Amino acid sequence: MLSQAQLDEFEKNGFLKGDVVLGDDEVEALREELDKVMNGETVARPVLNRNMLESDSPYDNMKMIASERVVQIVNIWMASDRFLKHAAHPQICEEVAQLSHTNSLRIWHDQIQYKPPVTGGPTAWHQDHPLWPIIQPADLVSAWVALDDAVIENGCMWMVPGSHKWGNHQRYLSSTKDFKPFHKQPEMLPNNAVVEAVPFEIKKGQVGYHHCLTWHGSPHNRSEMKRRAIAVHYMPGHTRYEPVGEHVMLSYVNVKPGELLVGDHFPEVFNKAKVQI
């Protein structure tokens, strides 16, 4: 459970470093599962498995020759019971519920991001919720767990403190040559907005939380180290299906616009009144 000081820090900054929640054996087990999914060794498949910098096809076999890549796997929990169990991690879910001010949580979707050594590419500055144009309101919180130490040298995430309070600015976000964020029309920002990024280094097995409107991104991995992580994007129980655009999860929605987003592909993983899965 998070302390009041931690809750206040998240409210102020839009991100928070949590505890080390996975031991070495648990991390290694998830790494092995990840390798199986990437190599196509599982019967079930995730929703998406691709190089973010190269392809938009629904499923790629990861045997790529691109000079840079960021391996993205969406909903690895659908291909791996071990990752489903991770998504229902009791401490993570309890703390996300605190940060989301909710008594229940469902998986919106999860996401592996793997930046291989030397050739790991950047992830552009962005806000999550504007890229999810089928759900409202913007109350989601993500739990990002490092499967390798994520440090400046291997392309850790960077965050802009307080940016979750500024609204939707996704279309105006860009970066300098040295990966500093900037806003294409800064006059649209609040008068007190300070666009200054800070590194969000996360230890292997540690969890980091961020709000769905927090500006974040990550630069190249030019080191000899891998940078693997599993992010689970959790939606509070009051999240509704409000489609205004396309999304990879759209085909899995079986409710009407305006209704709560529920269903087998959006499993409940936390409820104070029920036993968790």
Model-predicted regions and their roles:
Residues M1-K12, D19-W125, W132-I134, G245:
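Non-heme Fe(II)-dependent double-stranded beta-helix
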Residues D8, A150-W215, T239, G258-L260, ...:
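Double-stranded beta-helix
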Residues D56-S57, Q127-D128, K177, P181-V195, ...:
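Short, surface-exposed loop/helix-turn segments at secondary-structure junctions
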Residues N103-L105, H129, I134-I135, V145-C156, ...:
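Active-site region of the double-stranded beta-helix
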Residues D128-L131, L140, W215-N221:
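Glycine-rich phosphate/pyrophosphate-binding beta-alpha loops
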Residues P133-I152, E201, Y209, H233-P236:
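Short, conserved beta-strand element in jelly-roll/cupin
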